[in-house]
């Protein structure tokens, strides 16, 4: 009979199954992932979402972090949707399907409202974004931080609609760029029976707080012109005070047969931030005639417009004049206008129509929230405004309660987002806009007015007679359907500029070719100027400045060309340097740890992520409010704050940016701070592991070592080579057992060092100094036993290790196998690593102590020499021999012929009672016949290391006697002459034949020369 019930057996089997699943998961983690290579590059927003998003069993897609909260500090449980959310990053406890190790690898992401530039590519030296765009770095940073805009004409014409024909379908689409940054197309149908198929159309201009002055159109005789109708005259006047002028001017219409629309509009007169007067020039007033307005009810219940056209709604001809007389202000989402605050105003608009142009659809809309715009049944292509045009289809369900029911009298239509479907329009992208961002900045005009005219021409709308250019058929659009020249500041503007350099575009090769042609032009101009120097011609200061400027421009162009080629080769897209999706690290890499008591330690990354989310939500509220992306100062300031928050997260305080600190004024550690440096993630946790047969000690200079040798302390050598030493002792029958060999080693017998020298003779060691930045950071050396506890190193190999002798430490590694030792001798032996693998230049260059020592040996003590010479001259009396300026020799060619025993026959050179100073004063100008005599006098302290002497020289030497005049020429009675120069002396006979030559030198230079000669003669390295 079984001891347990079936239920118990089932539960036991379930527990065993769970343990088996957990064991498999742990085993899979312990196996690890074998990575062959890693390439660092740019990640697209789609790739980041792919890394972070995952689908739950119920079909919910999670991964986006929307809540800035981390955990509940009372229960320490993660907040839903926050930076420690269990749905996004994994469970905090082991379950049947997952373990807590998932929280070390799962990413999240933050969807940014406005794109921001990556600080590594913006503020680095050099700035890759500035190089690629060929713009000054300060201007690119100003645009990124929303302190500068790309161009004013783009902002003025952002509400301009365009009508682009589609010859294949016989239809055309006009799109209006509203304040929200989303297109609201209106579909119209063209009559194929007429030749006049389209005309240039404009939406009603809108005033924002940043728009203070708009131009008046003075010439109304043109058929096509921008419609800029009013000026802002005063902020102190209300529309109520100007109501009479507005209504009087609105009754003026053209005298031709035109369609005249009348509309009644409610205005919010108490919440106006600007007021304006309509002003018309004298030339325009002649085009107006008075006409009695059509009768229409003016009661507050009338919210629709009346039409004074005929039944067919068409016209016989097109008027050459057009006008549009109304005002507007930003759409306000909150606060409806109360009945007591409403003021009824009547206005009219007049506009021409093409023959045969009929409307395909009519929209019935209601007034927006506090908007100063005409509402009602609008069958016009002018002034059409959809209060829901900022919403997309997938946003309707999530924003059902965004709008409230209006309080207008007798309002029968609802104004909620549920009616968004009735206002939906098909998206159209069949229009063309000139792209002026690809124009080189070197072609800019110096005059701002000329530049504005050029931008106005390039940003003008499409005419019906325009034909599309084949090269621009595949124009790249943003994901929102807008052309990439819409944003004028912030990261979105930089991203749209970088879209021109997308490798998938065909014209990127044209840009590269253009840069190559510009580089060739610079090379040609540089060669012309350099040829002047080669031919020995004189180069003026202006030409020299031009040459330096051309060198700088060529370097800049080549750097840009190299960057463009890199993007083409790697297939990376430059717009990925602008972040629209920000990845969030796994929570276990930025933990929250509970300390003793109620204290909690929070990683700095959590605070930086929170600041990014807070500012992103702030910008989202502004985007849903009354502020536009380009024109609102509030929106630009919010974008700048978001940019600074992301910069602080990636690299806090980089490039002189604002540093985010904690309550103790300590800068928070960013992602870059956690990666770089000695305490960074790589060097602290991933590198520098302990290995066997290795040691570490301080390095000191060993000038007597050869280049491939290093001094190894005896204490370290005993420990590192103990197995080899024991084997050698047993092989030589010195010790019978391993225990006996170890006992002999501990005794420190003299025979141990002899055997150890034999072991080290054919066994290299590897020296390494961290950080190992290139392959020369680890080299093989022949060890030599030295006393002490420091490693001796030849000073010439220090540049390869970037080492000096101020306390640096180096690690010693012992290659064990024969293969490792053979590779050490052949590949990384120090005497074979003479040239740098990066530049090909010699890397074994003298530096620091060696240069200082050589300088000290070869320098001259001119001040001391002059004082001793003057002292010796003052003691001379009745000298019949005239002096050779300052270099008059006391004994030498003028007194008697120099012989081999010149120094021995001089005045008291070896006198024991003379001091070194007196001997030096006497022999400061002495002549010596050989280098050995000079060194002998130096070792007897008769000369100092820097004493100037004359040395007889039998070999040739380099002298500047061709361009140098002798200081003095002396001729004796026999015709023999002596020519004295600054650093040499010649004696000729009467026939002009050279008898002797002397060079002026010092004992230190002679000592250095002999050392170098001996080294070269013995072929030592």
Curated annotation (Swiss-Prot):
Compartments where located: Plastid, Chloroplast
HAMAP family, per the entry: RNApol_bact_RpoC1
Higher taxonomy: Eukaryota, Viridiplantae, Chlorophyta, Ulvophyceae, Oltmannsiellopsidales
Keyword DNA repair in annotation: no
UniProt enzyme class: transferase
Organism: Oltmannsiellopsis viridis (Marine flagellate)
Name of the protein in its database record: DNA-directed RNA polymerase subunit beta'
GO biological processes: DNA-templated transcription
Family matches, as SUPFAM superfamilies: beta and beta-prime subunits of DNA dependent RNA-polymerase
Record-listed E.C. numbers: 2.7.7.6
Binding-site positions, Mg(2+): 804, 806, 808
Cofactor binding notes: Binds 1 Mg(2+) ion per subunit.
Summary of subunit composition and partner proteins: In plastids the minimal PEP RNA polymerase catalytic core is composed of four subunits: alpha, beta, beta', and beta''. When a (nuclear-encoded) sigma factor is associated with the core the holoenzyme is formed, which can initiate transcription.
Region named Disordered: 161-185, 287-330
Purpose: DNA-dependent RNA polymerase catalyzes the transcription of DNA into RNA using the four ribonucleoside triphosphates as substrates.
Gene Ontology MF annotations: DNA binding; DNA-directed RNA polymerase activity; magnesium ion binding
